[in-house]
Amino acid sequence: MSRGRRPQQAASGYDCVVVGAGPVGLALAMAAAEEGSRVLLVDAGNLRSGKRDIPRDASFRTEITDPLRHADASLTTRRGVGGTSWLWGGRCVTLEPIDFEPRDYVPRSDWPIRLDDVTPWLEQAARYIDCGSAVFRSSRPDWDGLSEITMSNLERWARQPKLARGLGARVLAHPRVTAMLDSRLVDLEMADDGSIAGLVVERGGERTTLHGDAYVLAMGGLEVTRVLLDVQSRHPHLFGGVDGPLGRYYMGHATGSIADIVLTDAARAADLDFERDEHDTYIRRRFTLTPEAQRRHRVLNTSFYLDNPPFYEHTHRHPTLSAVFLGIAIAPIGRILLAEGIRLRHVGPRPYRVGAHVRNILRRPWQAAVDVIDILLRRYASPVRKPGFILHNAGGRYSLHYHAEQLPNPDSRVVRTVGDDGTPVLRVDYRYLEGDVDSLLRCHELLDAELQAAGLGRLEYRASDEDGVRALAWEQATDGFHSIGTTRMSARPDEGVADGDCRVHGVANLYIASTSLLPTSAEANPTFFAAALAVRLAHHLSAHARRTERTGRSDSAERSDAVGAAAD
């Protein structure tokens, strides 16, 4: 590894050039290096830049059409080693077989691959992301009486989500990895045969062209899309053409809470709390609908989990929640403890009812002190970071949080325009559909019906009628953290940007490793699965590199055939 190598010294001789040192790029670089490939890892940031907001770039700007629906880039992206893991909560969830299937009620839902194509690489991704294991099913039985609802789906949590110190350090120390940091990708050079001739990067005001056998764009979803849109502006026939799929089908998730869950037996809440498994990793069971129920009721994949009441609602009267609220409401303290996007969600809208929260603390100050110390020790002083906490109560009442799939929508998109001053603009027009909310409300109804029929509990909505509940769901419909779909996989080039091997359609040696590849959003947070796709891609590319080394051939046509046929 060499971090200090001058650009002209690091310009050629690599099996794989990876742009982006976030979770997905790091996983790809490590997997490829462990397979024997020579990897050049390029990132616009450095070892420390992920700790702060990305400085404004005079070469382009981003405009968000509806800020109520999409978070600002300062809350969702970072540059440098570790990338957006500096802001990541660490939740790891895999996709399910139904997520890959064509569903007639979900347009453009067919993937060019199936879960079985990625399963062999899940364990390796879990090792890199540090979530203990690729076991995502609980062996514990569901509660008696549940049939369309299951509790077997697990979410796992990275022991330490900020990956720069762990995976990042190992990647940079690997002898087969050369890192070029503080090097911004500015262009893709096209060869006469339509392949990539090289990547142009700028470092310290100096431009240089990097050469490798394969090039992988492993930045965040919007950044990968921006780069390809920029190239398409000069080569309109690429990536499906200017009216094609590039930038369309932008998805994330619907997430929030519109109801409380009231358990008949308050002790059952422990079944849905965080726990450490045999891998010394935190896991949590969740409510999800079985695949059969999803098909029968024609609903999108949706998960539910227990949560505390909103910290900012002083009416919870809980001293610990109020103490936590007051701590994170002080911005300099809260930003140390939480990523800013998460902090803002917990502190809620102004005005803050500080006096009411102080009175809550004074009811039982010793409980607040003991609980807060325990939370701080388990979350910030432990080698295995506890991702959250649930304060149990004798009434069995908890906030019910949802995380729901979105419908693929071609009008939810990002486009490249040019401002009046000539600066390229990435315009983000992120949208939800009424169908997203319809499915979400129906899933709540199905969960409520099963709980009541089995005598296990009930849901109590936070609005008095259906219109009010729907309005609450729309109020919370916002994302921008999960950039899915804008370079979607597809079997045909007119339906997507990349094929099932993550290779860009029509460009033999250009690949994508990003959450933007996913054609559907499922209910799963996308980071872990994108890392697994990257590990799979690394094995494909490394197999081709070994074959090329044996035969001495590396032309683009051979690469296109060889990688497409690499070991599945």
Where are the predicted features?
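A glycine-rich dinucleotide-binding beta-alpha-beta segment and adjacent secondary-structure elements
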Residues: M180-A191, R378-V414, L426-T520
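FAD cofactor-binding and catalytic pocket of flavoenzymes
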Residues: D243-L246, T255, A259-T423, G480-S483, ...
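Extreme N-terminal leader/targeting segments of oxidoreductases
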Residues: M1-C16, E34-E35, A543-R553, R559-G564
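Glycine-rich Rossmann-fold phosphate-binding loop(s) that bind the pyrophosphate
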Residues: V19-P23, A44, M219, T515
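Redox-cofactor-proximal catalytic regions of oxidoreductases
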Residues: F60-V135, L407-T417
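N-terminal Rossmann-like FAD-binding beta1-loop-alpha1 element of flavoenzymes
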Residues: Y14-L41
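Conserved redox-cofactor binding core of oxidoreductases
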Residues: D104-G198, Q476
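Glycine-rich loop(s) and the adjacent beta-strand/alpha-helix scaffold that form part
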Residues: E34, L47-R48, E202-D277, S514, ...
